[in-house]
């Protein structure tokens, strides 16, 4: 009986530890890092285009009912949305640090896929949302995305 309880507790702790790593479809590259980014009731964001639809999608999917304060400088924002033309079409890179998250994408499609990854990556609790620190890079492996 002791072995059964020990095994059950071990497996439970393992599933909790890898919770933040489960994203479907699996990104091309995921590098886990130590720490978490915890977003509370107030979130500041920086974006080159504050009217982009993927920002509304992010708010609906991940941070609903949270007031957003827009920043004019990247360094002051909790979350930064940056266009990076060096990424392939529909590609994105997410870098999550304990103090800031930077989402880079080549185009609006890439930002949309990044939001879907963040939706799965987020762990919510009372009044806050937590993201495990990591670097995630993804882009289509073929001409079109599919499961």
Where are each of the predicted segments found?
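Acidic, contiguous N-terminal accessory segments
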Residues: 17-142
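Hydrophobic faces of well-ordered beta-strands that scaffold small-molecule active sites
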Residues: 145-147
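Bacterial Sec-dependent N-terminal signal peptides
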Residues: 1-23
């Amino acid at each position: 009986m002791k072995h059964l309880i020990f095994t059950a507790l071990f497996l439970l702790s393992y599933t909790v530890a890898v919770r933040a790593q489960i994203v479907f479809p699996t990104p091309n590259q995921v590098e886990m890092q130590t720490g978490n980014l915890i977003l509370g009731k107030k979130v500041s964001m920086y974006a080159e285009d504050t009217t982009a639809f993927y920002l509304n999608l992010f708010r609906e999917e991940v941070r609903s009912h949270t007031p957003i304060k827009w920043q004019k400088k990247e360094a002051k924002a909790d979350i930064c949305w940056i266009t990076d033309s060096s990424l392939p079409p529909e590609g994105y890179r997410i870098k999550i640090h304990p103090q800031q998250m930077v989402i880079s994408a080549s185009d609006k499609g890439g930002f949309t896929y990044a939001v879907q990854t963040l939706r799965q990556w987020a762990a919510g609790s009372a009044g806050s949302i937590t993201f495990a620190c990591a670097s995630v890079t993804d882009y289509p492996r073929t001409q079109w995305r599919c499961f």
